[in-house]
Amino acid sequence: LGSADELSANNQVEELQRRRIKGEAHFLRALYYFTLVNLYGQPYCPKNVATPAVPLKLTEFVEDKDYVVNTVEEVYARVLADLEEADAYLKGNEVKNHPYRADITAVYLLKSRVYLYMQNWEEAAKHAQLCLDLQSELVDLNTFGNSETAFATASSPELIFSMGGNNIPRMLNDQFAGLSASADLIECYTQNDLRRQFFLTEVEYTEYYDCNKYVKQEATNNANVSDNFMFRTAEAWLNLAEAYACMGGENNEQEARTALDRLRQHRIETSHYEATALSGDALIEEIRAERRRELCFEGHRWFDLRRYTVSEKAPFTGSIRNTYSKYDYFWDDWEWKYYWDVSSSSTYELTAGDPAWTLQIPYEVLQFEELAPNPRHERAPISTEN
């Protein structure tokens, strides 16, 4: 940003390029700080926004000074300020058909996400609709093709913006992957939900499912979109649905159902599709479940669970459990392949209000800046099996 301010434009084209660079930079800084505040700060609660989050550093040069931790409110204010700057610089200043360059559509979608986290339902709905007014297409899985084609790619008509791809999706999509889809996630999909086919794949000779959303099983190529920083039209439809559902009232709930069903019509087998008839908290919960099914493996779930715990509408008061297992691997000369057995498993529980919903600031940062650590307590498993 500082360098862009020092550039002089010789003509209108160069000035538009300079403004575009500034707009993209403001968008990216907003996205980075939005990510940081949701990792290391408490979830945004309108009644309690003075809690510590992360330091704000807005200069590009090294400064010899001590930084202080800014509050959740201050970081969110900075995120929105950067998005307003991005809006001003990118509106009407487009680079068409470039998935790795943020434009005004991406700005609107990120704004809708930020306002959704802030529980500002009206602004969330407004900016989701602004995004959809520019790009609303959804892939119809009923006619998508065969199971050999990956769903999330740089050429998808749903893609609004993505950072570059990496090899993580490929590394987590073979029989030796260190992670797999949870049984709870798999059970979220009905047999008529086509996402089960295009988002997940069963690992041969096991009871596990891997993600095949970005690359197919045993693929040798890396994903060409990010598994954490990807913006799709599907999210805009879900943001719109959730915002209207949380506003409440007959008309708003009908808008929510319409937005939700627009997505579901493209995901459920046509012969088994039924329109949504829910209302009230049941509608909100169904939209949240749909969000989990649709946005799995895109970096949304942890942040969503955090914000549900402080939501004024249908707050999440339960707990989540995860089981971590250790495996013994062995080679079978006769079958010429590896097999494995679970040697031990430990189950941990995270309840609503637990400080572990906020990650600990890395040790190196705490030492360098002499910052106060986020509160934690020693955690023991609730059960262990050997």
Residue ranges and their predicted role:
Residues 101, 119, 123-234, 269-271, ...:
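Hydrophobic-face positions in mid-chain alpha helices that act as interaction patches
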Residues 90-125, 129-131:
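Aromatic- and glycine-enriched pocket-lining scaffold segments that form the walls
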Residues 14-16, 39-73, 77:
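Short coil/linker segments at helix-helix boundaries
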Residues 76, 121, 250-253:
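TPR-repeat structural position
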Residues 1-40, 70, 87-92, 221-228, ...:
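Conserved, well-structured interaction surfaces
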